[in-house]
Regions:
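Inter-lobe coupling linker of SF2 helicases/translocases
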Residues: 230-247, 266-280, 284, 303-405, ...
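Conserved Helicase C-terminal RecA-like lobe
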Residues: 107-108, 148, 152, 156, ...
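SF2 helicase motor core recognition
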Residues: 237-240, 292-294, 469-471, 510-532, ...
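Conserved helicase motor
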Residues: 202-213, 233-238, 262-265, 463-467, ...
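A conserved SF2-helicase RecA2
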Residues: 537-546, 550-620
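Conserved Walker A/P-loop ATP-binding site and its immediately adjacent core
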Residues: 156, 170-191, 293-296, 464-466
Length: 620
């Protein structure tokens, strides 16, 4: 008789001579060995990390082999009970998520009690939809919030904290997020708990913590009195041991902009997984859960459910990388109960005005340079994209060497590229570039910005290149316009001061780029006009940049206006605009995302290669 049992892990017991024969059999080598941990004292013990699904597979395998050996297989009551309990646990968890999202009437009384507790503990009240999202995250303990950028995800998390502070002695939030989101978390905490709980923040990137050891020491000795601890993704690995010591029952762990954790089994993913493993409450926030492919959810789900992933989901990396329609349907069905997602429309944010697209005709010189670039880079569309953007900003940039790896932020995915272009143009072309005046598009942007400023409207101008930002600052400054720049080289403390000055009215124009300032910065209280001088097909950056001025908190009737500058060239095949092609692509990707939200599924966005093929479809 063979006996399968459970005593903390699965075991197989059989007579010693049969066990010895089994251990050298082809059945063991081909079927069981991958699951086995050790064989000793007449017992085969299976790996402790196996899931109940693995146990069911082992039972089926052993049943077939027992029949072949004409012996009885007994599955113990303890093993059956463990499997049944796991199935029931996951079923209950999944059912609760669905009931919360459907606002099941039987949960109404508990929701109202939750709402009363949260409202009593917050100075700034949550909207009804935000309160349901907060209730969902609290009840699920580990979940994701995929609400669109600008829909108040941070406040919903703070509502969860307010409830747990009152009911479960929670005393701090640890937030892992990009540095440029630190200010938003501090501002939101201060606003939500004004007069109730003062902000006591530990920012491990503050100037006084210059070394890794100083940061680790701060977490060990200064964190106890803090209610908000801020760490960026890059720094987690260096202070992981100190952070893990904080993961007690009084800590809420938040991963904000969790789409930053892209690469499967990469450093960010492994650190996040380790940190989340012992946390009781974990929330993952992102407005763009699947920016590129379904593989993007692999890390997210492992962070939230490290021990349950195989049982709850079980999707392999190859399966997520190239999903069939059936796989996509299965992923969405399995994932639905574990995330909430709210649109700005549901929260009553007034709709933005229709985009104002401003067409600018290219000069003869610009048309000639486009033809040269078209011939030179027809086999490298990313290089062509970057070079045309440079032409439209400052043609002199075409004479500089180009390392395409420096422009990966233009992409929506993590495609690797290391090609370097050394810009070996002929003397004739160099002369053409040297004698080129300011680009037509640049002049139109300065004109539009000045017009809006003269109407007493604060303005954000979005660029891609730091060179564009600096030249635009010089041009606007020469016209007496007060402007400041925010890009990667600007220290975090200086960025925060610039943003505060902009909000206070000391700055008329803010010049920046999406990969520096697109995330988690709120400027909607003072600014309602944004100009896009340069833009790429990175939908994440576009949506997040738009939401700096269009987000929860806008009063009814408040306008929001976006301006897109588009330079139009004359080619042999007629008029063509890179800006126009990119803009159309972005609108299509945004439509796909919003349609997916309406249909309650997670969207998959095109790859960068597909984007480039579409954008240059009208040029080649």
């Amino acid at each position: 008789m063979w006996t399968l049992d459970y005593d903390g892990s699965m075991t197989l017991r059989l007579p010693s001579e049969e066990l010895e024969a089994l251990s050298i059999s082809s059945f063991y080598k081909l079927s069981l060995k991958r699951y086995a941990a050790e064989i000793a004292d007449g017992i085969m013990r299976f790996k402790p990390a196996l899931t109940y699904l693995d146990y069911k597979k082992i039972i089926a395998l052993c049943q077939k082999e027992a029949v072949r050996h004409q012996t009885e297989l007994v599955v113990s009551e303890s093993l059956r009970a463990y499997i049944d309990n796991r199935e029931l646990h996951l079923e209950i968890r999944s059912r609760l998520g669905s009931e919360l999202k459907d606002r099941d009437p039987k949960l109404r009384e508990r929701f109202e009690a939750y709402r009363d507790t949260v409202n009593a503990g917050m100075a700034r009240k949550l909207r009804e939809q935000q309160m349901w999202d907060s209730f969902f995250m609290c009840a699920m303990k580990k979940s994701a919030n995929f609400s669109v950028p600008g829909s108040g995800k941070t406040a919903s998390v703070l509502g969860m904290y307010a409830y747990l502070r009152e009911k479960a002695a929670m005393h701090r939030i640890v937030v892992v997020c990009p540095k440029n989101a630190f200010g938003s978390w501090m501002d939101e905490f201060t606003a939500c708990f004004a007069g109730i709980e003062p902000l006591r923040v530990l920012n491990i990137h503050a100037p006084q913590y210059k070394t890794q050891q100083q940061r680790r020491t701060a977490l060990q000795y200064d964190a106890g009195g803090c209610n908000l601890i801020l760490v960026n993704y890059e720094a987690v690995g260096g202070v992981l041991d100190a952070l893990e010591q904080l993961m007690d029952t009084g800590t809420l762990l938040v991963f904000d902009e969790v789409h930053k954790v892209k690469r499967i089994r990469g450093e960010y993913a492994e650190n996040a997984l380790q940190l989340a493993r012992n946390a009781r409450y974990v929330v993952a926030l992102t407005g763009t859960p699947i920016p590129n492919a379904y593989t993007d959810i692999y890390n997210l789900l492992h962070i939230l459910f490290p021990d349950e992933y195989d049982e709850c989901f079980g999707f392999t990396v190859p399966q997520l990388r190239n999903p069939r329609d059936a796989d996509i349907a299965a992923v969405n069905t399995a994932l639905q109960p574990f995330f909430c997602r709210t649109t700005k429309e549901q929260l009553g944010v007034p709709a933005a005005n229709a985009d104002m697209v401003l067409q600018v005709g290219a000069s003869d010189t610009e048309n000639r340079l486009l033809r040269i670039l078209q011939m030179k880079y027809r086999k490298n569309k990313l290089a062509l994209l970057v070079r045309i953007l440079q032409l439209e900003s400052d043609p002199r940039m075409l004479l500089q060497a180009l390392d395409l790896n420096d422009f990966r932020y233009l992409l929506d995915d993590t495609a690797e590229t290391s090609e370097i272009d050394y810009a070996d143009y002929s003397d004739e072309v160099r002369s053409l570039i040297d004698n080129c005046e300011e680009s037509s598009k640049f002049c139109r942007c300065i004109e539009l910005t000045e017009k809006l400023v003269r109407q007493n409207k604060p303005v954000i101008v979005w660029c891609m290149f730091v060179g564009s930002i600096r030249r635009m600052a010089d041009a606007l400054g020469a016209r007496g316009i007060r402007c400041r720049c925010v890009f990667g080289e600007v220290p975090l403390e200086e960025r925060q001061q610039i943003l505060n000055d902009f909000r206070a009215g000391g700055i008329q124009v803010l010049l920046t780029n999406p990969h520096t300032l697109a995330e988690s910065v709120s400027l909607h209280s003072v600014c309602h006009d944004a100009i896009y001088f340069e833009y790429s097909y990175n939908l994440v950056h576009l949506l997040q940049s738009k939401d700096r001025i269009h987000r929860l908190g806008l009063p009814e009737g408040q306008y929001t206006q976006y301006y897109y500058l588009q330079l139009t060239y004359q080619t042999e095949d007629g008029a063509w605009s890179l800006d126009g092609a990119v803009y159309d692509r972005l609108r299509e990707k945004e439509r796909i995302m919003l349609e997916a939200i309406d249909c309650h599924r997670l969207e998959r966005m095109p790859t960068s290669e597909e984007d480039l093929d579409t954008i240059f479809g009208g040029l080649f």
